[in-house]
Amino acid sequence: MERHVPEPTHTLEGWHVLHDFRLLDFARWFSAPLEAREDAWEELKGLVREWRELEEAGQGSYGIYQVVGHKADLLFLNLRPGLDPLLEAEARLSRSAFARYLGRSYSFYSVVELGSQEKPLDPESPYVKPRLTPRVPKSGYVCFYPMNKRRQGQDNWYMLPAKERASLMKAHGETGRKYQGKVMQVISGAQGLDDWEWGVDLFSEDPVQFKKIVYEMRFDEVSARYGEFGPFFVGKYLDEEALRAFLGL
């Protein structure tokens, strides 16, 4: 039997990412005195302004989304240069007065990742650098889902030679490039960090584009044979005014 020679993908890592999904106890929130709700709002607004200042200083990015369906009400999406500032962002939200009305529904921790199957990428490349530290769009919609590469029988991604993986990913990338200008994609790796191997964020001004790109990519061999997908979350970006309206203030 021929011995399998491991050929791991070359990766570059960027910002750390936390998808923090929360449920809002609407009954408790609206039964609270207006003064208490206003105080909670002012504290939350101050926290978000701190996140905005960090983004403007190039020390991270953020987005808050109203999530459709029963899986969550809000997504607090934060990107930071390391785990420690990401933990601080999570803790600050959890210690806030607004958190008294929130419950945790799902979370995913990962690190922005760029991969090359055959040769290392140049971290100083003007093409590579911005993709390692992406800025979350401040409008439109997000679609997030975790995924794995299959390791089952003959469909074992990790047993494929690097050249074959490269060929499959190239075809997959060509499908994605059809949506350039319509969908922004951020891939983050989570091997050893969370329960799935990757997180995928899609950003668009038109949520129907999420359906189109995911459906078309399902026909790529790399997805049809080797892709395993977790839950999908779709949300609408909330600026300060929209977030306040969502909270009924």
Curated annotation (Swiss-Prot):
It catalyses: Fe-coproporphyrin III + 2 H2O2 + 2 H(+) = heme b + 2 CO2 + 4 H2O; Fe-coproporphyrin III + H2O2 + H(+) = harderoheme III + CO2 + 2 H2O; harderoheme III + H2O2 + H(+) = heme b + CO2 + 2 H2O. This is Coproheme decarboxylase. Involved in coproporphyrin-dependent heme b biosynthesis. Catalyzes the decarboxylation of Fe-coproporphyrin III (coproheme) to heme b (protoheme IX), the last step of the pathway. The reaction occurs in a stepwise manner with a three-propionate harderoheme intermediate. When reconstituted with heme, can generate oxygen using chlorite or hydrogen peroxide as substrate (in vitro), but has very low affinity for hydrogen peroxide and chlorite and extremely low enzyme activity. Its EC number is 1.3.98.5. Belongs to the ChdC family. Type 1 subfamily. Fe-coproporphyrin III binds at R131, Y145, P146, M147, N148, K149, H172, Q185, S223. Pathway: Porphyrin-containing compound metabolism; protoheme biosynthesis. Homopentamer. NCBIfam families: PRK12276.1 (NF008913). GO terms for biological process: heme biosynthetic process. Disulfide bonds: none annotated. Keywords: Heme, Heme biosynthesis, Iron, Metal-binding, Oxidoreductase. GO terms for molecular function: heme binding; metal ion binding; peroxidase activity. Gene3D superfamilies: Apc35880, domain 1. SUPFAM superfamilies: Dimeric alpha+beta barrel. The gene is chdC. Its cofactor is Fe-coproporphyrin III. The active site is at Y145. Fe-coproporphyrin III acts both as a substrate and a redox cofactor. Was originally thought to use heme as a cofactor. PANTHER family: COPROHEME DECARBOXYLASE, HEME-DEPENDENT PEROXIDASE YWFI-RELATED.
